[in-house]
Each structure stands twice: as C-alpha cells, then as structure tokens.
Amino acid sequence: MKGLFIVFEGITGSGKKTHIKLLAEKLKESGKEVTVLSFPNYESEIARFTKRADLDAYTQSLLFAADRSLYQERIKALLEKGNVILCDRYCYSNFAYQAAKGLPLEWLKEIEKHTIKPDIVFLIDVPVEISMNRVKQLSIEDFTKKEILERLEREKDFLEKIREIYLSLAVTDKETKWFVINGSEDISVNHEKIWKKVKEKLKIE
C-alpha cells in the first residue's frame, strides 16, 4: 500500500506548523500512520552548516539540497509502508528563497531533480504584513521574537519576492498538485479545506 506525501509551503508566519498539527491529529483519528518531517533539519550537520555567514547562495542551495537528499530513502520506505508524510517545507522553499536572491530557478530545480516529489503541496499564502503580525503574537521569548521581527522588517521586499515565486510555482509546476490556501482566512475554515482534499486523496469517508 502506497502512502501519501504532503508538503506545506509558505513564508514565515503563514501558519504551516498549525495546519500540519491539525492535519496530523485528524489523520491519526482516522487510523493513519503519520510522520512529520521538517526541512532544513538543523539536527543534521549539513543543515547546521548552512547557517554560516560566509556561504554564498549557490553553496547554501547545494547544502539544503544535500540535507533533503539524506532523507530520500527514509521517505521512500515510509511511503512503501503506507505512512502519510507531512512535511514542513521541502525543495520548493529552496526554489523560492534562493531564486528571490537571484539564483536561476532552472538550476535550483536541476540540483533537486532526484528528490521524491510529493503528491500534494499546500501553499499557505499570506501577505507579508499578516505574517509579521502573527510573529508578534507568537508565544516565544521576547528577544527571539524581536530578532525575527527585525529580520522580517529588513527583508520585507525579499519576502514579497518569495511569495510571488511561490505563487508562480503553484501555477507552473506540473510535477505535483498544488493547492493555494488563503492563509488570511480563519484557521478552522482552511483546515476543513485541507482535510477535504486529503480525504479525497486517501478515500476516507
């Protein structure tokens, strides 16, 4: 029995983690085996290396791709067992963030061409202003929150570019099925939309 591979994408503060948590709970209630993954996985040495300030964008992109490459056999095995994989970011984050820095999108796709493609990508789309407001409301240490908000403020235009690239990928990527979710809407409304699509795919009554 083949499992289902679902990826959630979106800018910081879009609500990916919330929707992954809600969907995981619903799937478990339906008797499904669920595995949650997140990329970059900063527990791996490769991903930690990407935080070095002296790295150029090309090297960083290759390291992010290598981090995902380490997990391909595990993803394959889980899918063969019938698991549902929920992934917080995948290769599309590399495409959007690095292309926004000016790297060629075709090159970014080339270095990730051997990654297992998901069955569904949910793009949780929110305007940058909303993403910043949500970060303000997060229950995290004030210093960490201040640091994130300062970075978001500095990178406002950059985040707008990332958002545009994500929306473009949702239209042009023919290798997998994308669903754009209006992340400005009520969480419970969006959860029901997501659950409806997943139920259809898994043939859950």
Walk through the language-model features, giving the residues of each.
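Pre-Walker A (Motif I) flank of P-loop NTPase domains
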Residues: 2-5
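Hydrophobic anchor at the beta1->P-loop junction of P-loop NTPases
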Residues: 8
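P-loop (Walker A) phosphate-binding loop of NTP-binding proteins
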Residues: 11
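Conserved lysine of the Walker
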Residues: 16
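Hydrophobic positions on the alpha1 helix immediately C-terminal to the Walker A/P-loop
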Residues: 19
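NTP-dependent small-molecule kinase module
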Residues: 24, 132-205
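ATP-dependent small-molecule kinase phosphotransfer cores
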Residues: 32-116
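A glycine- and Lys/Arg-enriched "phosphate-lid" helix/loop adjacent to the NTP-binding pocket
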Residues: 94-164
